[in-house]
């Protein structure tokens, strides 16, 4: 009795919250709280056993990422359940619904993608495999996507709440840099279960970029990306070659090219952008405002403005890629009869604001409306002209047809660029004062244009008689490089998601 009374303080009636640390083996076996006293805990003293603590025991609980993968798998099964009743026996013939056994191609199962994201993150520097999944079903006999439910190939294991979050993430973090979607118009048809293939592709492209820029949904990006590419390719192979092209298909290719560039899949980004350029030409978006066309009805103003934005974004990407790689430009400015896009605020609110033509905007020293994206387009045009002049001069030199006015052309471009830099400083706020991704990129683009003009001159320096002129351009190029470094340091003060995502396409090497 005395010994029991003596040991009672070590076992209080009201136990406190278990201390941090490991319990002994006896307490674990009996599922009791261990007080952790040394050399023996209270339970071991009462039991008369040796108190042993195993310091090599693995931590309790499920493995990292297991619960997330389990939730995604449950959500996927919930989504597929109604789809099986809608699709019926056709689902087994869908080439995109067949699960792939190769881990490298397994992008349709989000549950597998989520489990991989916790242990082995996807590579960010290697080129992805763009081949279509192997199938024994011919393209002509495969069912149309229009007959399927909203689950494309079983790769949409997300609830309506997650869809809404991904859509909002896109317009919060992606749209400020790539302003090619009308938010109300997109959300209007995105909620409908029945969508045509091009809109499904665009929706998945939106989710691909949104998940890339999300900490919560990053494990879904590979699945969304693979499904978008496969659906785009399959719709091209199975569709009618004479069928009209939808704007949503071009928008999807532009977003996918941007995603691939951000993931450093540069060759794939170039190929995807090329598809967008050819579709832009096929839709003749370069002549939306041609005087030979009838006036646009008021009900179609938003749709027409969206087409303008798609064209100019494709034009902008074309020039950025050509500038970086010294490639010929695909979308030539001299055949464009499409007005520049209206400011995004007016576009989203549906106000009919008519932009200027490119040739007018380049020479306008007192712009009536301000748009950072339009400034980027104008600066890209100046660089494109410099690139074209340098390429043309090199070809003429080979054929012995030297143009005597190269210096005059370069001087004219330099004067136009100087005016645009002054407009940026006078009519727009400083990029350090306002967090606008397109405005920051416009300022960086302006300084990069100075460097690009110098590179164009350096490529044909043998054609320039005045050596002092070359030295002056070199000094200005060095000053522009220092200004870019200064602007880039200022971007570190902003949120990562507020940085312009087209900056992943470098203007210069």
Curated annotation (Swiss-Prot):
GO terms for cellular component: nucleus. One of its GO terms (biological process) is DNA-templated transcription. Residues 1-22, 97-143 are annotated as: Disordered. InterPro entries: TF_fung (IPR050815), Transcription_factor_dom_fun (IPR007219), Zn2-C6_fun-type_DNA-bd_sf (IPR036864), Zn2Cys6_DnaBD (IPR001138). Keywords: DNA-binding, Metal-binding, Nucleus, Transcription, Transcription regulation, Zinc. It is found in: Nucleus. GO terms for molecular function: DNA binding; DNA-binding transcription factor activity, RNA polymerase II-specific; zinc ion binding. Residues 132-143 have a biased composition (Polar residues). Residues 109-119 have a biased composition (Low complexity). It comes from the Eukaryota. PROSITE patterns: ZN2_CY6_FUNGAL_1 (PS00463), ZN2_CY6_FUNGAL_2 (PS50048). Induction: Expression is stimulated under green light conditions. SUPFAM superfamilies: Zn2/Cys6 DNA-binding domain. Residues 24-51 bind DNA. Transcription factor that regulates the expression of the gene cluster that mediates the biosynthesis of the mycotoxin citrinin, a hepato-nephrotoxic compound to humans due to inhibition of respiration complex III. This is Citrinin biosynthesis transcriptional activator mrl3.
């Amino acid at each position: 009795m005395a010994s029991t009374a003596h040991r009672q303080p070590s076992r209080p009636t009201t136990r406190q919250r278990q201390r941090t640390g490991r319990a002994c083996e006896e307490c674990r076996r009996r599922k009791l709280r261990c007080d952790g006293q040394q050399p023996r805990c209270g339970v071991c003293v009462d039991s008369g056993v040796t108190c042993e603590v195993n310091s090599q025991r693995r931590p309790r609980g499920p493995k990292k990422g297991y619960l997330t993968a389990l939730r995604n798998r449950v959500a996927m099964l919930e989504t597929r359940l109604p789809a099986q009743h809608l699709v019926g026996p056709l689902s087994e013939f869908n080439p995109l619904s067949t699960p792939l056994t190769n881990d490298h191609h397994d992008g349709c199962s989000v549950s597998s993608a989520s489990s991989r994201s916790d242990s082995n993150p996807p590579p960010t520097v290697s080129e992805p495999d763009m081949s279509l999944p192997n199938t024994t079903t011919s393209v002509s006999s495969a069912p149309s996507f229009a007959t399927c439910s909203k689950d494309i190939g079983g790769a949409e294991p997300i609830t309506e709440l997650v869809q809404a979050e991904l859509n909002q993430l896109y317009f919060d973090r992606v749209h400020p840099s790539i302003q090619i979607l009308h938010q109300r118009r997109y959300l209007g048809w995105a909620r409908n279960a029945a969508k045509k293939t091009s809109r499904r592709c665009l929706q998945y492209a939106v989710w691909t970029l949104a998940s890339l820029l999300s900490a919560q949904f990053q494990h879904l990006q590979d699945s969304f990306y693979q499904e978008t590419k496969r659906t785009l390719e399959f719709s091209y192979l199975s569709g009618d070659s004479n069928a009209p092209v939808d704007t949503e298909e071009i928008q999807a290719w532009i977003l996918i090219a941007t995603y691939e560039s951000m993931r450093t899949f540069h060759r794939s980004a170039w190929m995807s952008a090329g598809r967008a350029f050819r579709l832009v030409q096929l839709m003749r978006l370069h002549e939306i405002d041609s005087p030979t066309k009838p006036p646009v009805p008021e009900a179609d103003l938003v749709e027409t403005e969206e087409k303008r934005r798609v064209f100019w974004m494709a034009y902008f990407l074309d020039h950025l890629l050509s500038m970086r790689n010294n490639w010929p430009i695909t979308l030539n400015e001299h055949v464009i009869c499409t007005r520049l896009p209206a400011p995004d605020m007016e576009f989203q609110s549906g106000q009919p604001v008519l932009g200027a033509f490119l040739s007018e905007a380049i020479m306008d020293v007192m712009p009536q409306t301000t748009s950072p994206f339009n400034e980027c387009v104008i600066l890209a045009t100046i660089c494109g002209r410099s690139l074209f002049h340098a390429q043309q001069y090199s070809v003429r030199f080979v054929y012995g047809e030297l143009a005597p006015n190269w210096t005059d052309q370069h001087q004219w471009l330099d004067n136009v660029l100087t005016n645009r830099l002054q407009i940026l400083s006078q009519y727009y706020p400083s990029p350090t004062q306002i967090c606008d991704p397109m405005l920051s990129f416009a300022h960086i683009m302006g300084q990069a244009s100075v460097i690009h003009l110098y590179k164009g001159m350096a490529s044909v320096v043998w054609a320039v008689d005045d050596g002092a002129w070359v030295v002056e351009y070199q000094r200005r190029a060095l000053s522009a490089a220092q200004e870019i470094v200064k602007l880039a340091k200022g971007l570190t003060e902003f949120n990562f998601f507020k940085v312009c995502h087209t900056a992943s396409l470098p203007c210069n090497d």
